[in-house]
């Protein structure tokens, strides 16, 4: 059986380490390389408190790293400042990037799409790899047909750099597809402290919480006459994301276009 050759960018981070561990457990995948600016020179096995694997962690990702390892897929869990550069490196090397790092804006995505069109190499971007989170968004979209008054609270660990989360923005996008334009709240509402009502996207308020002890959580709260409905998803550990990431790696290896969202791989 031909194995999918996977390179992990950001392998020294919490998500990166979990991805590496999970790839090592897959019969149809082979870890061929890893990069992390803070762990350069270390064996990836040593980083995971395992026996050496003979894979030395490189510094910031370069095209040469991907070509030398003959990777099929580059999984990226770095930071918003590095993810676009890493995606460009992957596409230039003929490697399909699977991007889990959030923080890409519309201009970044447009640039990636143009490069995909030029190189004919596929790419995959997911705001969230948790299958439960995808279902939460689907359920919220269905509920919005009947409960148009809605707000979102997303809660993450205090080291997350971007706000609101990509999942919250994607949830608004899905809800807006079925929700008629609506001005919520009192027309004369005002904030005593700027930002008290959160960010407003398409008339839906998003509130971002950043605290230690949290991983990734989201509530979509609907209000109606005499009733309220809350749809919530909790990621209780980073293992939450592994089934979705492995699914994405398997599916992305067959791509020749840009695909955004894990929902595209769910039957």
Curated annotation (Swiss-Prot):
Signal peptide: none annotated. GO terms for biological process: diaminopimelate biosynthetic process; lysine biosynthetic process via diaminopimelate. The keyword Cell division does not apply. One of its GO terms (molecular function) is NADP binding. NAD(+) binds at residues 10-15, 100-102, 126-129. (S)-2,3,4,5-tetrahydrodipicolinate binds at residues 157, 166-167. It catalyses: (S)-2,3,4,5-tetrahydrodipicolinate + NAD(+) + H2O = (2S,4S)-4-hydroxy-2,3,4,5-tetrahydrodipicolinate + NADH + H(+); (S)-2,3,4,5-tetrahydrodipicolinate + NADP(+) + H2O = (2S,4S)-4-hydroxy-2,3,4,5-tetrahydrodipicolinate + NADPH + H(+). It comes from the Bacteria. NADP(+) binds at residue 38. One of its GO terms (cellular component) is cytosol. InterPro entries: DapB_C, DapB_N, DapB_N_CS, DHDPR_bac, NAD(P)-bd_dom_sf. The active site is at 156 (proton donor/acceptor), 160 (proton donor). Its EC number is 1.17.1.8. It is found in: Cytoplasm. Catalyzes the conversion of 4-hydroxy-tetrahydrodipicolinate (HTPA) to tetrahydrodipicolinate. NCBIfam families: dapB (TIGR00036). HAMAP family: DapB. PANTHER family: 4-HYDROXY-TETRAHYDRODIPICOLINATE REDUCTASE 1, CHLOROPLASTIC-RELATED (PTHR20836:SF0), DIHYDRODIPICOLINATE REDUCTASE (PTHR20836). Belongs to the DapB family. This is 4-hydroxy-tetrahydrodipicolinate reductase. It comes from Desulfitobacterium hafniense (strain Y51). The lineage of its organism: Bacteria, Bacillati, Bacillota, Clostridia, Eubacteriales.
